Amino acid sequence: MCIRDRHNTKRYLICFCLLVSFFFITGFDSLDDYPKSKKVDVFDIYHGQVIRDPYRWLENLDSDETQTWIRKQNQFTEKYLNEISEIKAIETILDQALDQATRSVPFQEQSKYFYYYNNGDWQQSKLYYKEENQGTERLVLDPNQLSKDGTIALSGVSVSPDAKLLAYAISDGGSDWKTWKIRDLESGLDLEDEILWSKFSGAEWLKDNSGFYYSAYSQPKTGAELEDTNTNQRLYFHKIGEKQSSDKLVYARIDQPEWGWGATVSEDGKYLVLHVSEGTDERNRIFYQKLHQADPSFIELIPELKAQFQFVGNEGNVFWFFTDLNAPMGRLIAIDIDNPDEENWQEIIPEQNHALRNVYLASGYFLCHYLKDVSSEIVLYQTTGEKIKKLDVPKNGAISGISTKPDSSQLFFSFSNYIQPKEIFEYDLSDQQLKSIWSQLVPGFYANDFTSKQEFYRSKDGTLIPMFISHLKNIELNNNNPLLLYGYGGFDIPILPNFSTKYFSWMKMGGVVAVANLRGGGEYGEQWHRQGMLHNKQNVFDDFAAAAEHLHQTGYSQPSKTVIEGRSNGGLLVGASLLQRPDLFGATLPGVGVMDMLRFNKFTIGWAWESDYGSPENKDDFEVLFKYSPYHNIQPMTCYPPTLITTSERDDRVVPSHSYKFAARMQAAQSCENPILIRIESRAGHGAGTPKDKVIDYISDMYGFALHMLTSN
């Protein structure tokens, strides 16, 4: 996005005076004022049907023509936003709220405890460690030193088993591409090792500290690094002190270009376990290799793609897996790799009536993280499967960042909910004592001023959908409150009740925040996911519309006072919802959305989403995709709600051309004075690693725009 001085209060004082007029945007008297987006006669034929794509030229991201379009759209949007006083009000709240220290849940290696910390002034959090039983902290990495604007971020770390070396990854300008480096933790200096073109990969160390496994792709074509398709991932071993060109190729399948690799070294150091995935499909295969053996071949333990299997740990030749095979809510099984036929598998922890999300091995116990109506519970089991107890941890919220080790009795995690900021806890399994070790302070936030509750409402087909609703206690529920409705609904991802300063800023301004836990997510296991994927995707949009209708019927707000927000798959949700039910919303905020459902699989990692969306090359899938694809369902000469589309130039997850094309077509179709704007951030990607100031600017612009539209309606 354009650069602006966030501390220039004079600009906002002038803007406030201008807003006295009913026609609050002085330069926006006509739809003709939008920057021109030319139409080109481009079309494809899908299954005998001609599909026109007049803005295909915007997919050429680096062309002079596209760059000129971006510049003019940003200038137009900035001119509009500069005259909205609510932006400054939101910015002030966020500046204050984020001007305070934050830290992460610690993780342990040997006697060192590592954690991220930000004093509130830094653009990026720094990595520190403390020695056990010592109070002195030591700085390990400061990503703020890597760029003047804070746009080079730390995107992954992995400590060697002896805690002497750190493999760390940096990402430039929000890209998913990672460059791995190695730091000596004693000297604080980097070795010469450098690994390029890694993506969707961690670093998994051998127990002898000699090196680590990682996944990488071939170097993309120059100039196409942010848009070329990512296939044929390969698994390598990097030996410390050697060049990347000498790294050993451990596994690759040229015959399976869409397979990806997740490597885990067993705690006893005897096995390399390979999670073999296909895109974002929750199902996976399991291969393993016996390390330090003469035969380096992989054994296909689970060769078929039939369910999810996540390696938890092992005891000798018995491997434990979390799986949803014949158990949509999840269970734990044991497989003897010397007797691996499925009829010999043993169930250790059976499926419960609520969703099992993760299983951890600690001090000879299994720690199971369940979601019960979207709130976290941790249950302790013997390795034989005998239930011991449900841990006495905070309730009615989200437990996140669970950190422990198989040989440790310490468990670290954080807890929060929509009106309780993050608190970090340590639980000692040896004496079953829970201790708070850090609490987030949010200036301006007072928990007693707010209320939050969970309600259930019926969707179009009668399914009960949970939703959290939060707001100031003293507001009157008179159908006149600015309402922010957020949703996602996809890829088995649960949206948990975590505290968010952006939601706090909305509530502080007198608004209501509602977060709907739509089908397609992981809140209630794999069946919940399947009810919102592929040919069932319309259920997600129906769930979202029903959430808005419920909130309107129960006094929280009304259509003209309701804004919807979603990002990525949630951006698709907002795009489809505003086109299907424009009558329900007074403003919309689609962020980094998947808007062209016929070409999403043509760029970077988009092909991987076919497991949730289907493929436009398949006729049956095409019929479903074309029916809801936001870009293809914009109707000419229609009055759509005020909309602020947001994306980033360096988003190589959901490439920005999705939003560019959607904005161009929406602006051409709009038949009334409701603005259709696009805000295009520079030096940023899909969201991860965005520096603090850019985050504040982004939220302020979005929520300030939305508040202004809703209060003007």
What are these model-derived regions, one by one?
Residues N144-V157, I170-S175, L189-E192, L429-D431, ...:
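Cap/lid segment of the alpha/beta-hydrolase catalytic domain
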Residues D341, Q382-T384, K389, S403-S409, ...:
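Extracellular/periplasmic ectodomains of large secreted or surface enzymes and adhesion receptors
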Residues V515-N713:
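Active-site-proximal cap/loop segments of hydrolase catalytic domains
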Residues N118, S277, S416, Y486-G490, ...:
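Glycine-rich His-Gly loop
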Residues N133-Q134, G173-S175, L185-G188, L206-N209, ...:
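Secondary-structure transition/capping motifs at alpha-helix termini
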Residues Y116, F322, H369, S414, ...:
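Short hydrophobic segments within beta-strands
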Residues M1-R6:
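Conserved small/polar residues in nucleotide/adenosyl-binding loops
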Residues I14-L19, F23-Q410, S416-K422, Y427, ...:
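Beta-propeller folds
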